[in-house]
Regions:
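Periplasmic-binding protein-like
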Residues: 94-100, 140-163
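Extracytoplasmic ligand-binding site segments that recognize negatively charged/polar headgroups
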Residues: 1-105, 109-119
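Ligand-binding "clamshell"
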Residues: 17-21, 136-147
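A ligand-binding cleft/hinge motif common to bilobed small-molecule-binding domains
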Residues: 119, 125-142
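Conserved C-terminal helix/tail region of periplasmic/extracytoplasmic solute-binding proteins
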Residues: 218-248
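Sec-exported extracytoplasmic/periplasmic mature domains
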Residues: 53-57, 78-82, 102, 119, ...
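Mature extracytoplasmic/periplasmic domains
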Residues: 153, 157, 162-223
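Short, hydrophobic alpha-helical packing/hinge segments within bilobed ligand-binding/sensory domains
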Residues: 48, 114-117, 133, 171, ...
Length: 248
């Protein structure tokens, strides 16, 4: 990071990705939230715990564990139980997911599936990444996207330099360009085309009233990240537990 002039302008959560996990610099970020049809439900959803309400039986879709936010969903389940996921390797989380199962219609892999289920009335609630918002909103104009007040989980996209890179200095220059105020401002302004990227440069003035602005503020204020140095060694076990709990 010391070689990047624009690194100093990154939001703290983005800096932590490089510092804590050893990845390359983050250049964009996504966050997980809840999209729902208030009219179909007759009530609002404000927290992750609301997903476990019996009134939502047979109304929810959540991402498969191999999805970008699959592991984050496991973390949400552990949070619901009030257990630090690292203290039991996810045991409480899968107990919570078993309790959630009656409410789950499907575990999905693509946002297009969520859009189709909303438009057909098959579901009224889904856990999605912010990047899927536009796709689902087009299929279900009345749908509302919320980030729970208690917080959420963010996923950072990073740029890494390969071990045998022959142009390291040039690679750093390109990364610095990608993190610049000009570039991050330009890419964040494309939301109307469904391409808006949430920036990590804290100096970017994102457009008001957009999903990009919403995510940008949430990540700065109350987003956590998944520690993949903890998760990856457990993924095979978790995948088996996931299938036994939700797909058997």
């Amino acid at each position: 990071m010391s070689k990047l002039e624009n690194g100093k302008d990154m939001i703290e959560a983005a800096k932590a990705v490089n510092k804590d996990n050893g990845y390359g610099p983050a250049y964009t970020v996504n966050a997980m939230g809840i999209i729902y049809d208030k009219e179909a439900l007759g009530f609002e959803i404000n927290e992750w715990a609301d997903l476990w309400k019996p009134e939502l039986k047979g109304k929810i879709a959540i991402p498969v564990i191999s999805n970008t936010f699959g592991p984050a969903m496991v973390h949400v389940a552990s949070d619901y139980k009030g257990v630090d996921i690292k203290s039991d390797d996810g045991k409480a989380a899968f107990e919570a997911l078993a309790e959630l199962r009656p409410n789950i219609v499907k575990t999905y892999s693509k946002s297009a599936e969520v859009a189709n289920m909303f438009s057909s009335g098959e579901i009224a609630v889904a856990v999605i990444g912010d990047y899927a918002f536009n796709t689902v909103k087009k299929a279900s104009p009345d749908a509302t996207f919320v980030y729970p007040a208690s917080g959420t989980y963010a996923s950072f996209n990073t740029i890494d330099i390969t071990k045998n890179c022959k142009n390291v200095d040039l690679a750093y220059k390109w990364i610095d360009y990608r993190l610049s105020l000009e570039t991050e401002t330009r890419t964040s302004s494309l939301e109307n085309n469904g391409l808006g990227e949430v920036p990590v440069n804290g100096k970017v003035e994102v457009a008001e009233g957009t999903n990009v602005e919403n995510t940008f503020n949430v990540v700065r204020e109350r987003a956590k990240t998944v520690d993949y140095t903890f998760v990856l060694p457990l993924m095979e076990t978790w995948t088996n537990q996931w299938n036994q709990t939700l797909n058997s």
